[in-house]
Design a protein with these regions (language model features):
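A conserved mid-protein helix/loop that constitutes part of the nucleotide-sugar donor-binding site
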Residues: 22, 26, 236-250
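Membrane-proximal helix-turn-helix segments that form the acceptor-binding/catalytic region
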Residues: 136, 148-184
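Short alpha-helical donor nucleotide-sugar binding micro-motif in glycosyltransferases
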Residues: 288-289, 296-301
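Aromatic "clamp/platform" in nucleotide-sugar-dependent glycosyltransferases that forms part
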Residues: 307-309
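Short hydrophobic beta-strand element within catalytic cores of glycosyltransferases
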Residues: 326-329
Length: 405
C-alpha cells in the first residue's frame, strides 16, 4: 500500500463548496489515483462532499454534526462560525496521534484551523497552500480593499490567521527531534517575494494553477451565440456590481436585441438593484446549473464581463477563455500575470473605457470576429488543466520522499 496523505480540511462547513474546496478535492483525487492512501480530517459536511464527489478516501470526523445555517454577514453568524471552526480544530488536535511521522500532512487552506494541526502533528512531510493574499492591516482599517467586510471582523480574522499560520509553518523545522521536510503551494506569481522573505527556498515552493476542466469543456459542442454578455459571481461590491449594471444599461441602449445571461442563484439579490434601470427584458437568470450547463452558457455568449474591483486567481476567467468566450475586465494587478493578453483590459476603474471595450468585443463577435481564435489557447489549456496541476502536486509529494509510484 502507498504512503498515507492526510488533508486537514476543517473549513468545510456546508456542502456548497467554493473554489478552494474544488482545488483540494482535485489534488486528493490525483493523489489517490497515484496510489496514496488519502485521509481527510473534517466534519460531517466534508464527509457528504467526499461522498458526492466519489473521492476514494477516508474521513476522520472532527465534529458531531453539521453546523446550522447562519447569517455570515451578521456578527452573531461570524461568532457561530468561529466557534464551529474552533470545535473542529480542537477535535483535530486530539486526533493527531493517528498521523505517523512517515505520513504526509497537507493543510488545504492558510487558516489556523488547518495549518496549526499540520505544524503540531508528528508528520515529517508537511505541505500547505496559499490561495490568496489576505488584505493588509492598513487596508482593513481604511477598507482600502473591496473585499473587506463592513464590520471588518472577518477580514481581521483572515489577516491575522494568514500571518500567523504562514510564519508557524515556515518556522517549524523539526518534529519530535527529526528534521521536517516542507512544501508550500501558491496560486499567484506575485506571492513569490513574500515567500522568499519567509525563508522558503525555490525547491520548497510550487506555483500551482487554479485548475480548469479542459476535457469537459471541449466535450460540450459549440453553441449558437445567443447572449451578448454573460456574468457569474456574488452580488458584492468587490464584484463591481454598480459598474456591471451601468455597463448593461449602456449596452442595452446601443445594441439592438441585447441579451444577457446571469449564471447562478442571483436573481433575488439582483432584482432590487435592477429597479428603474429598464433591464428586465434584456436579462435571463439561469439559477443553479450543473458544470456542463455552465460551460454551455459560456459557449452561448459573446462576451464575459468582469468588472471586479479585486480578485485573487479567478478561475472563472479561465473557464470563459477555454470556452472561447472573450473576456473584458478592469486591469487589476493580479490578472496579467495569470492571463496575459488573453483578456481585453480597461484601465481601472474607468467605467466608460470598460463600457466601450465591452461594446467593441460584442460587436466584433456579432460580426464573427473572435480574438481568441488568433491566440495560443492550446498552451493556456495545457498549463492550467487539472491534470497538470495534479502532476505538480504529485511531484512535490515525491520530492518530500517516499513518493507513491
Amino acid at each position: 500500500m502507498g504512503p498515507r496523505l492526510h488533508l486537514i480540511t476543517n473549513g468545510v462547513f456546508t456542502t456548497s463548496i467554493a473554489g478552494g474546496d474544488i482545488h483540494f478535492l482535485k489534488l486528493a483525487e490525483g493523489a489517490a489515483r497515484a496510489g496514496y492512501q488519502v485521509n481527510l480530517f473534517g466534519g460531517h459536511a466534508l464527509r457528504e462532499v467526499v461522498a458526492q464527489h466519489q473521492l476514494p478516501a477516508t474521513v476522520t470526523l472532527t465534529d458531531e454534526d453539521r453546523m446550522a445555517r447562519v447569517d455570515q454577514g451578521a456578527l452573531s453568524g461570524q461568532v457561530a462560525m468561529f466557534r464551529d471552526f474552533y470545535g473542529r480544530f480542537r477535535r483535530t488536535l486530539q486526533l493527531l496521534p493517528s498521523i505517523a511521522p512517515e505520513d504526509y500532512a497537507y493543510a488545504v487552506s492558510d487558516y489556523w484551523f488547518d495549518v496549526l494541526p499540520v505544524v503540531r502533528s508528528r508528520a515529517q512531510r508537511r505541505l500547505m497552500v496559499l490561495h490568496m493574499e489576505a488584505p493588509s492591516f492598513a487596508q482593513i482599517v481604511t477598507r482600502g480593499r473591496p473585499d473587506v467586510d463592513p464590520k471588518r471582523l472577518a477580514s481581521l480574522h483572515y489577516w491575522a490567521s494568514q500571518e500567523y499560520s504562514l510564519r508557524r509553518f515556515c518556522a517549524a523545522t523539526r518534529a519530535q527531534g527529526q528534521p521536517v521536510r516542507r512544501h508550500l503551494f501558491y496560486l499567484h506569481p506575485l506571492m513569490e517575494p513574500r515567500l522568499q522573505r519567509l525563508g522558503l527556498a525555490p525547491a520548497e515552493r510550487t506555483l500551482l494553477s487554479y485548475g480548469l476542466e479542459v476535457g469537459p469543456t471541449e466535450a460540450v459542442p459549440a453553441q449558437e451565440r445567443i447572449y451578448d454578455a454573460v456574468w457569474i459571481g456574488r452580488v458584492h461590491r468587490q464584484k463591481g456590481i454598480e459598474d456591471l449594471l451601468a455597463t448593461l444599461q449602456f449596452l442595452a441602449a446601443r445594441l439592438s436585441g441585447f441579451r444577457v445571461m446571469m449564471i447562478g442563484n442571483v436573481r433575488e439579490a439582483m432584482l432590487p438593484l435592477l429597479a428603474g434601470r429598464g433591464l428586465e427584458k434584456h436579462l435571463e437568470f439561469s439559477g443553479f446549473v450543473s458544470e456542463e450547463e455552465k460551460i454551455r452558457l459560456f459557449k452561448a455568449s459573446r462576451c464575459f464581463l468582469m468588472p471586479s474591483r479585486h480578485e485573487g486567481s479567478p478561475r472563472v476567467i479561465g473557464e470563459s477563455l477555454i470556452a472561447e468566450t472573450p473576456v473584458v475586465a478592469y486591469e487589476i494587478p493580479n490578472y496579467r500575470p495569470l492571463f496575459g493578453d488573453f483578456v481585453r483590459y480597461a484601465p481601472p476603474f474607468d467605467l466608460r473605457a470598460f463600457q466601450q471595450a465591452a461594446q467593441t468585443e460584442i460587436q466584433r463577435m456579432r460580426s464573427g470576429e473572435n480574438y481568441l481564435r488568433k491566440m495560443d489557447l492550446a498552451r493556456f489549456k495545457m498549463e492550467n488543466r487539472w491534470e497538470t496541476t495534479q502532476e505538480k502536486f504529485l511531484q512535490a509529494l515525491k520530492g518530500l520522499g517516499n513518493g507513491a509510484g
